[in-house]
């Protein structure tokens, strides 16, 4: 029995040490010697893309989220389908929804010109999300880099509840985020990414027409113009009508007025849960929201990264080597 206990303790120590080593291998200075121009190349590609289409900022932040929540931040979301790979792009939460792949491809090609085989696609996604936030007036943070790319995709996992559903309850959202090592404040802060971007009609139609007490009547009436009861499933609507292209704290002010577009937005405020206080705090203090958003993005970027000799550095982000 004592021998078994000792083996168990040693095994747990090994797991903890391995986890610590993985985190230690991620560093903001990871490419300082091997590819010092990497981050500037990525930044240039991102800024060019958002200057062309403002909506792309939200898309790049969302891509990072959808990558990290399915099997960790490993760029598995970028892989196209082949005879041996079922692409996450085709999973229900991502299909014709996640976008910005061409921006990542462009950034990768620019980096490859100066540092071939050095910078991972997973790191490019993470850096692009930060640069997108900064470009539209949001916070900037030091991205920890050193991730490697997966050699597989995880479509079945993406379809199995690893990503939030558009009708999830607060308890479901909190449970999902907790499973990823993120707390309630992280949930509310990361949801603030919906201060920019757009959503498709079919994702919020039911909320508009259910005549619920948690939606402002005037807001619902305005939104119905672009989202009829039948048809128009793909019609786009700004998540924040007031400042749709600026990364500010207006999203939280909207929630307090029952003007959250998605069910998963509005569940953050109005039920008397602990999230109410956080939403109220962010609505009054943009700087606090920005700081907490940056902290949460760093934490999210540390979800199960591949490091060391695990995975690979893809030559082309959409295919394994």
Swiss-Prot record:
Positions with a binding annotation for Ca(2+) 1: 67, 70, 72, 74, 76
Glycosylated residue positions: 211, 285
Cofactor(s) required for function per UniProt: heme b; Ca(2+)
Binding site for substrate: 164
Keyword RNA-binding: no
UniProt keyword terms in alphabetical order: Calcium, Disulfide bond, Glycoprotein, Heme, Iron, Metal-binding, Oxidoreductase, Peroxidase, Pyrrolidone carboxylic acid, Secreted, Signal
GO-annotated molecular function: heme binding; lactoperoxidase activity; metal ion binding
BP terms from Gene Ontology: cellular response to hypoxia; hydrogen peroxide catabolic process; response to oxidative stress
Signal peptide: 1-24
Compartments, as annotated in UniProt: Secreted
Binding site for Ca(2+) 2: 195, 240, 243, 248
UniProt GO cellular component terms: extracellular region
Catalytic reaction annotation: 2 a phenolic donor + H2O2 = 2 a phenolic radical donor + 2 H2O
Free-text remark on how the cofactor is bound: Binds 1 heme b (iron(II)-protoporphyrin IX) group per subunit.
Disulphide linkage map: 35-115, 68-73, 121-317, 201-227
Annotated residues for binding of heme b: 194
Modification type Pyrrolidone carboxylic acid: residues: 25
Additional facts recorded: There are 73 peroxidase genes in A.thaliana.
Protein name, entry field: Peroxidase 5
Gene: PER5
